[in-house]
Design a protein with these regions (language model features):
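Rhodanese-like catalytic fold shared by cysteine-dependent sulfurtransferases
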Residues: 8, 18-57, 65-200
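Short hydrophobic beta-strand that contains or immediately precedes a catalytic carboxylate
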Residues: 12-16
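Conserved small/polar residues in nucleotide/adenosyl-binding loops
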Residues: 1-5
Length: 200
């Protein structure tokens, strides 16, 4: 049923995930909110749907939980025809594989465990945040004072030892007691917090 709805030209498909999740995988026809934090998602989606209150809206997310909350919010805001992908991308990927169907979702499904992603199709739709090469491998910077989540290709990973910059590579190579000083330095931590990838 969702497959038919997603292909309907009168349907607005909304990705209810943060940009770092959707940049590695998404439904082809989806509108992607350009937000980095979950708290900003609902206001942004409401803004995106302004003037389309009578459209059919389909929501999707990783496992379905965020869509439950979002659909209640949107219905309360006057958008009455809201549906969601039951079980999220996880269930969708399982179902299409089981039934041998072509996936309308391309790329990886970002997951919140050590894997940081489950491949749904072989498509790579994102690029390395450092050099622009095709890549969909999320990493946490190995400099624990930074620890930013970013996408890195294998060449940049090798060149920077899993760090997001030369500065972080230098810090990550220090003895652990020296690294701890950076973690405790609030000025350094605040500076890293606002790192923006070229993708964003």
């Amino acid at each position: 049923m969702y497959k038919r709805q997603i292909e309907n030209s009168n349907t607005t498909v909304i990705d209810m995930r943060n940009i770092y999740e959707s940049e590695v995988g998404q439904f082809i026809s989806a509108e992607i909110p350009q937000v980095e934090k979950s708290k900003d998602l609902l206001p942004e989606v409401r803004r995106m749907l302004k003037g389309r209150e009578h459209h059919q809206v389909l929501l999707y997310c990783t496992g379905g939980i965020r869509c439950e909350k979002a659909s209640s919010f949107l219905i309360n805001e006057g958008i009455k025809n809201v549906k969601q992908l039951q079980g999220g991308i996880i269930q969708y990927a399982h179902d299409i594989k089981k039934e041998g169907l072509e996936s309308k979702f391309v790329g990886k499904n970002f997951v919140f465990d050590a894997r940081l992603g489950e491949r749904v199709t072989e498509d790579i739709i994102s690029t390395c945040h450092l050099c622009g090469e095709k890549s969909d491998s999320h990493k946490d910077c190995k400099n624990d004072a930074c620890h930013i989540l970013f996408i890195q290709c294998s060449k940049c990973d090798e060149k920077l030892n899993g760090c997001c910059s030369k500065e972080c590579k230098k810090i990550a190579s220090l003895p652990i007691d020296e690294q701890i000083k950076y973690r405790k330095n609030q000025k350094y931590v605040d500076k890293r917090r606002y790192f923006k990838s070229p993708k964003l």
